Amino acid sequence: MATYVIGDLQGCWSSFKQLAAQLPAADRYIFVGDLVNRGFESLATLRHVKTRVEHGKAIALIGNHDLHLLAVAAGVRRLKDGDTLQEVLDAPDREELLAWIRNRPLAHFEDGVLFVHAGVLPPWTVEQTLSLADEVHRSLAADDDNAFLRQMYGDEPSRWSDDLTGNDRLRCVVNALTRVRLLSPDGAMNLKHKGKANEAPRGDVPWFDHPQRATRDTPVVFGHWSAEGLMARSNVIGLDTGCVWGGKLTALRLQDRALFQRDCPELQTAEE
């Protein structure tokens, strides 16, 4: 069985269909999050990916844009300029789709590879990453009154401590798994920088290059960082190649790490 890992879709379902048509023997998919927003087919994307997951043909992680959709639907956040989520919010199957998103995992591990949307903090082992991701997953799935969503946003605490509890603990995990790009030498998350790694503030490094990264011997596949684009190293693979910004949509065949790409039309002009 061939498994293909797909970078950020962000509502670009037509581009995915074109990419999928060129993949030989595509039996199963892993989507690294950000299924929705900024592209103009978020509703179709959700419906099709949901069906694939329910038939055992895919695994879909949750990303920051997917969380944003949940927060907007709950009245916790407002739509931003450039958001393309209204068709999901107006859909007759809205509640079913939102409930499905709430139950998406924040991390996945198989065949010796760790999958996340954004990144992993330096002290976290694979086992701890999966355990912390499950803490957030369970809190989000059980958040019937949206209390967790109301407390989820914020940049603090920026550093991990095993002593963190409650919403501070969960917020730190969410930020790491769905938002982080850069870290300071002492492991603090810089959640403001969205540009390339070589444009980072002095001293900050990509999360995957932090010298104390406990997962350095484990391949980690992620999305999220479209400005950095495709990255293919032995222990880290970045797949967000900016489809929604007129870049490419990228697929990684897990078994042999072969890469497949499809050019995408420019749907947005600048990432915010």
What residues fall within each predicted segment?
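Active-site neighborhood of divalent metal-dependent phosphoester bond hydrolases
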Residues: L43-L46, T51-D168
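Active-site-proximal beta-strand elements of phosphoester/diester hydrolases
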Residues: T3-Q10, V113-G119, G238-L239
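Residue-level marker for buried hydrophobic side chains located in beta-strands
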Residues: V5, Y29-F31, A60-L61, L114, ...
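Acidic, His/Gly-rich catalytic cores of divalent-metal-dependent hydrolytic chemistry
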Residues: L130-E272
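N-terminal active-site segment of His-dependent metallophosphoesterases
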Residues: M1-E54, A58
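Divalent metal-coordination and catalytic microenvironments
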Residues: D8, D34, G63-N64, I101, ...
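Active-site environment of divalent metal-dependent phosphoester hydrolases
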Residues: Q10-S14, N37-F40, H65-V72, P123, ...
